[in-house]
From Swiss-Prot:
Alphabetical UniProt keywords: Cytoplasm, DNA damage, DNA recombination, DNA repair, DNA-binding
Main location: cytoplasm
Domain of life: Bacteria
Stated name of the protein: Holliday junction branch migration complex subunit RuvA
Region: Domain III, residue numbers: 150-200
Name of the encoding gene: ruvA
Biological role: The RuvA-RuvB-RuvC complex processes Holliday junction (HJ) DNA during genetic recombination and DNA repair, while the RuvA-RuvB complex plays an important role in the rescue of blocked DNA replication forks via replication fork reversal (RFR). RuvA specifically binds to HJ cruciform DNA, conferring on it an open structure. The RuvB hexamer acts as an ATP-dependent pump, pulling dsDNA into and through the RuvAB complex. HJ branch migration allows RuvC to scan DNA until it finds its consensus sequence, where it cleaves and resolves the cruciform DNA.
Protein family (similarity comment): Belongs to the RuvA family.
Organism from which the protein derives: Chlamydia trachomatis serovar A (strain ATCC VR-571B / DSM 19440 / HAR-13)
Length: 200
């Protein structure tokens, strides 16, 4: 299984790119949004995180801009009724932050707007996403680094992340305070957020 492919971007369109590495051209399926971002790097070296889907008659690589996005894709396709193409369509429409917000607000209508997802599938997916929100949040934080100084930095960053998801400042402060009490003042924001979300 590949973690990522690093090489020269030799071809690009709205659904896939070709990366040449050591004389081999890898065709990688990706979202239209990511494709647009890559156009500025034609004939340059790029690094794309990949997930392999191997079937009896085909071997498909799906590409992502970050490890976090890749892990979110893997989470999505673990849900019943969500295949790789649908998972990619979801990430094309909703960046990680927005997907977290959709899950918290149980916005079935937003999920149902994704091509290939009907109302019943959207309702079921929403239940799954809501349960996995503590897993999604650290992914949204893009592999957070250790706070620069004290635990106060983690506390403030956590409040900001919760407010981005639609919580009020007062609610976010309460949730983070309870999370710190449960863990410790030295805990990272990635450790605190899943606990904080359970306090909502």
């Amino acid at each position: 299984m590949y973690e990522y492919i690093k090489g020269t971007l030799t071809h690009i369109n709205e659904s896939y790119v070709v990366i040449e590495s050591f004389g081999i051209g890898y065709a990688i399926m990706l979202s239209e949004r990511f494709s647009v971002d890559l156009r500025a790097f034609m004939h340059q070296e790029v690094l794309i995180y990949v997930h392999s889907v191997i079937r009896e008659t085909e071997h498909v690589l799906y590409g992502f801009s970050s490890r976090a996005e890749k892990e979110c894709f893997r989470l999505l396709i673990s849900f019943s009724g969500i295949g790789p193409k649908t998972g990619l369509s979801i990430l094309n429409m909703f960046p990680l932050q927005e997907l977290c917000s959709i899950a918290r607000l149980e916005n079935v209508k937003a999920i149902a707007s994704v091509p290939g997802i009907g109302k019943k599938t959207a309702e079921k997916l929403m239940v799954d996403l809501k349960q996995k929100l503590p897993t999604l949040m650290p992914l949204y934080l893009e592999e957070p680094v250790v706070p620069s100084s004290t635990a106060n930095s983690s506390f403030k960053e956590g409040i900001g992340a919760l407010m981005n998801l639609g919580f009020s400042r007062l609610a976010a402060d309460r949730m983070m305070t309870e999370a710190v009490k449960e863990l410790s003042e030295e805990a990272s924001v990635a450790e605190l957020l899943p606990i904080a979300l359970r306090k909502s």
